[in-house]
Amino acid sequence: MDHSESLTFNQLTQDYINKLKDAFQMLDEDEDGLISRGDLTKIYATLGKTLTDEEWSKMVPDNDTSTAEVGEEGVSFPIFLSIMGKNLSQFPEREELEESLKAIGRGHDLNVPLNEVIDSLKEAGFENPEEEFAKLFKLFTTNQQATEERTFRGKLFLDSITD
């Protein structure tokens, strides 16, 4: 897939569109066919957070022509697909991520010592990867009981972000 262009509907597999539809329906709290600010406010509240104007603006920028149909009422599914396609086209392919994890781990295994992942992220310009990626590390890291070394589970991570 060419990352210089946004994904179009015909570049998304039917399975992936179905996954995005499921995600859309989960976000559409009031089931009106739109993800509204009210829907997201409810979701944030269940997480103990408050949706700010700034966060809403970042999610649905007014100056983005692909979201011209977004108004006060919210985001329709076609616009949601467009937004997600644009965002997903910025991610590297699975093979690129696999090669990176193998290079970091100096082997063929996708499970990499967490300290090596953190060091590589620092070399790539992240100032505080432990904090910036804390949730990701919490989900995809295990402790090796024998050595007490923390291992980033790369295959599990890749399986969760690719279809």
Swiss-Prot record:
Cellular localization per UniProt: Bud neck
GO MF annotations, alphabetized: calcium ion binding; cytoskeletal motor regulator activity; myosin heavy chain binding; myosin II heavy chain binding
Keywords: Calcium, Cell cycle, Cell division, Metal-binding, Motor protein, Myosin, Repeat
Record-annotated EF-hand domain positions: 15-50, 92-127
Metal-binding as UniProt keyword: yes
GO biological process, one term: actomyosin structure organization
Binding site for Ca(2+): D28, D30, D32, D39
Gene3D superfamilies xref list: EF-hand
A cellular component annotation (GO) from this entry: incipient cellular bud site
Chief place where the protein resides: other
Domain of life: Eukaryota
UniProt miscellaneous comment: Present with 1127 molecules/cell in log phase SD medium. This chain binds calcium.
Known role: Regulatory light chain for the class II conventional myosin MYO1. May play a role in the disassembly of the MYO1 ring at the bud neck at the end of its contraction during cytokinesis.
Assembly mode: Interacts with the IQ domain of MYO1.
PANTHER family registered for this protein in UniProt: MYOSIN REGULATORY LIGHT CHAIN 2
Official protein name in the record: Myosin light chain 2
Organism the protein comes from: Saccharomyces cerevisiae (strain ATCC 204508 / S288c)
